[in-house]
């Protein structure tokens, strides 16, 4: 390369000026090159240093660190060089070995979000089981739809039938997902603790052919450690993560009955479904605005302002409510910078005992907050199904993710008043 020749010529001039002269021929005095480099003489008496592996620079005076220094990988991932040129002073390719729960070329994408059992984004119809225990003379049904983390009540979990020798419980995501782990919890039945002590995990793309996660040796099914009481959480992460539409848990050993509450962890398959900052307050109040706000009894102290519209916000006044029930109302989020938006989670609320929520809505997005584009699928504006109660999560995924800084929710139908808590998903 011409640039290399110029540098080499400069090196030669400097060395000669120091009183060091190379012998004639292809090879020159090796003492001119440091760290065991080989000295070569060019046609114009230009000096070149061919550096050994691990060194670079004009006279091999610099340590070659390669593309892994500094580490380009995020979240403490390990950087591995995958190819070199056998010269030792040029490295061209590397990969990042991601820790459990992260994905992406540089492990920049988190993949350990709760997938919807606890919050309700996964509907009852998506949860099934091999059997159900019927308690209290057949009046108590411990069905699979109850197997949601932290569920409360007298009957608050799934329990397999006592006669089921190979019980299982299954979740259908309705689409292929990346699943990175599971959180399990037992429950109390008739005042006595019941839980899974060990279990296996199987996964499937079609709901017919299932494969079990294998142990470290690859010779058998992996048995995961479960719980030790009825209420504490046990988290198990999958390494590697799974790509599946269906996940099954198979109890292996149980304390008294096989009773379970659980949550699955992961992300959308494209790995871009992290919460964008409403629930955790990363997005400041000033970046959440609305067309109007309702005030109970017309008092400012009881205002249902837009900054309250954060998913799972708590308190007596804990959501955004529009001043009027009109399709002209909207709630807007400024993400601060342009983000890739892949989904949305919505939730209603109560106004002093009155259940209120948005039943259907559209979504619009903008780069400048002035010109807006309504989200479309198949050439028409998409109407999303909203909530059915005041507290459950309803998750909708955008089949065509979009890049935007501003996102608006445009309510179309509602129960009682337009009331909303939400989170946006993306990266």
UniProtKB/Swiss-Prot annotation:
SUPFAM superfamilies: EGF/Laminin, Galactose-binding domain-like. It is a peripheral membrane protein. Its main location: membrane. It comes from the Eukaryota. Residues 24-61, 64-108 form the EGF-like domain. Keywords: Angiogenesis, Cell adhesion, Cytoplasmic vesicle, Disulfide bond, EGF-like domain, Fertilization, Glycoprotein, Membrane, Repeat, Secreted, Signal. This is Lactadherin. It comes from Rattus norvegicus.
